[in-house]
From Swiss-Prot:
One of its GO terms (cellular component) is ciliary transition zone. Keywords: Cell projection, Cilium, Cilium biogenesis/degradation, Membrane, Transmembrane, Transmembrane helix. Residues 1-116 are annotated as: Disordered. The keyword Protein biosynthesis does not apply. It is a multi-pass membrane protein. This is Transmembrane protein 237. InterPro entries: TMEM237 (IPR029409). Its main location: membrane. It comes from the Eukaryota.
Amino acid sequence: MGKKQVAPPRALPPMPSLKDEIPLSRSKKKKSKSNNVPDDLLQNAGFNTSENKDPLSPERRKKKKKRLSIDAETSLTQHNPALPVVQNGKDTDNQAAEEGTTRKPRRRTKKTRSVGQEFPNELGVEDEDIIPDGHTKIPEQNPAFLASSLTSQPVGKFFVEKNRRFQAADRSEIIKTTEQTDVFLDVKPTWTSMDVSLTAHHIFRMVGLFCCGFLAGYAVWNIVVVYVLAGSQLTNLPNLLQTYKILAYPSQCFLYFLLVLSTITAFDRIDLERTADALRGLLKLDPAALASFFYFVALILALSQQMTSDRINFYTPPTENGSLWQANTEEQILQPWIVINLVVALLVGLAWLFLSCRPDIDHTEEAMFIPEGEDYPDMEKGTKIQG
């Protein structure tokens, strides 16, 4: 009992290890926000993306340390005797644990906007544009535009654009130039295909009428020459053969040519498209129809005597060798030929007489001028009455 035991210095209770109780939170990688801007625009704008993909950690906040009471400290040392001793009132282990733990930042979710909300509704209807029934919106007219609706006063000068410049011109000069152009257009009208065809038709009709008159005179001259050379009662037929054999071939060819041309001219005056009307005109003694019929018959009769004309052209006396003529056969061969030439001359003369009485008659031209709607007016009236 000699010595008094000295108590050791009181040791502070160890702090609980945060490593054992609280697990360290691992740093999570932040998801990169979806950016609507394409990468090409970022590269063109000059922004370089960082190579480090780790998210930036938020700033660390110092956590205030709560001081424990003496009773709490003793209780902690009793329950956890393995806790380290705090030196100088500072806990190094706690600081290391605090540095390891990071606080999770709160993320603010952005609401996605629809495409229609990003742009203004340009096609929308405003309230001002809606007009109720019974109310019409009268546009306000500017008084400057009202003056243009008034009647303008005639001015003596006009401004005409010439060579990309406006030059003043008198009204009288412009009226004279317009009158001259109107006269020029009246003098030289435009020709159509119908005008050309009708003009050609008129020219051919005039030429054909002249040929018909010339044919009538030539046929009469031919028959007069034949009767003069044959003598009275056809007693001098050998004289006719010896004299006319030089004229037989050329005269007959010329007669055929005139007959063909006159026949075409006569048929051109009637409308051959309507054969019923042509036959009806022949029965009604139409001059154009009768002339065409006479010319056609004369042409057939003249062609029927072509062989006799050839024998007259090659005439040699019957006494010579190789002669086509036999003795005492001249009258038997020449008498029908003379009669037919006389009939041809009469037919041609009558046809010319009919045409000369009505030279302007032309049913083909009338058919070309009459419109299609006026062809059958009676039938149209009948259909209207039935309707």
